[in-house]
Amino acid sequence: QWLKKHYPEIKILMGGGFANTELRSLSDERVFEFFDFVSLDDGELPLELIIENIESGSNTEFKRTFLLENDKVLYKNNSPRHDYKQAQVGTPDYSDLLLDQYISVIEIVNPMHRMWSDGRWNKLTMAHGCYWGKCTFCDISLDYIKVYEPIAAGILCDRMEEMIAQTGETGFHFVDEAAPPALMRELALEILRRKLAVTWWTNIRFEKSFTKDLCLLLKASGCIAVSGGLEVASDRLLQLIDKGVTVEQVAKVTRNFTEAGVMVHAYLMYGYPTQTVQETVDSLEMVRQLFEAGVLQSGFWHQFAMTAHSPVGMYPEKFGVVKDSDTIGTFANNDLTYTDTTGIDHDQFSFGLKKSLFNFMHGICLDYDLQDWFDFTIPKTTIRPDFIYEALEEETNFSVKPNAKVIWLGGKPTVESFTKTKNGSSWNRMRLTFYDKKETFEIQLSQKEGEWLVTVLDLISYSNLKTKQFQELKADFENELEDFELFWFSKPITTLKEFGLLVL
């Protein structure tokens, strides 16, 4: 409004998340009292064409753009040009912005919300769209979700280095819908190889690919936090959502991140179609147990909203809800009003869920009865009090995928050969001393095993471009020595695994 009043010659374009989801059927000409153009989906080509049209003084070719012509809102998508691939979009240029003069609004209560707004993060994307793309509450029919296109780790690190040079800031927020675990692994290795001193965080799916070792690698590369959707902590509803995870699996993944020193934030949901009162209570109990186990540090409850571009919005009858109206408005058209056939008033749970979570995040009131959070009667939970504890019971996994990558994050050991004598017999032994950032430790092996390991640690160092697979190490070991599995699960190698010998 201020710009239009004082600088009417400046053209103003709107794009991004709000436009992409809410304004796809825009027809209200009043919007154009404030904006000259509204573009949808990927913004690079639409913006380029808008600039070309402004500079040439014509209104010919556009890409997914609303504009006003003869007092009527028109949607123009008549350019034959294709959108830019993610590898071609280049690095965001922040060099002209007064980055040190923006105000930080700090949210104290929620650790993840505080991180979002306390200070500034360089924003990047690992992949366009979502590699999962199935969640039924999500706008999976729109391009920003359904068109999945990952970016190579090398290109991402090039962009990170450029942005560090521009801004002098080394913190990165990857704004992915859900960052792909395999790409996160490659990015972490590339960051370590380039010796980039960065901190970063992103959104994920709590899937089983996030093993203990992968989480340790991500932490070593500078990952400080992840946020992911637990949504409704009920296996029946997670299946209906098509989340592709179970509560038990989420618990294990959050444990892996937490033990690696990475903060975990969970998006929580209530009021999903067909959700019963019992399931809401049980969901709260699951969340309580996750905080009690110390594997969740931050969370936020969202009430389910039905959107026009989600499977629930497109096929409400499959989810036991009835759309109240099919009328399309002239402005925002995404959030839909609906009637849940269960007839449950989910609003009544809002205050109790949020109040309990507020306390859980402070590590208090975990022993309260769930009834204490509500001023109306709720049923007893059906979840066993030790459900999460049992899910987290350690199981030693002796199976390793043959094609798993083996990486050593540590440095070169100092080596000392010695002879051990007992009952008249003597053996040649080797002592390997390692110097970690925090401590010094040593392991002892037979002379031959020690020599083999010293050579191999050099080959599997994170600094090498070529990685070694588990099956390659096994074959190489058994060429010279005997049972590799016995060696791999022996006490000295188990010690190394605690200090950065990773299987990915």
Q: Whereabouts are the PLM-identified features?
A:
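Short, well-ordered amphipathic alpha-helices
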Residues: 2-4, 51-52, 187-189, 283-290
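Acidic/polar loop patches that form or flank catalytic/metal-binding clefts of enzymes
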Residues: 58-62, 74-76, 148, 170, ...
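N-terminal [4Fe-4S]-dependent radical SAM core
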Residues: 71-123, 438-442, 498, 502-504
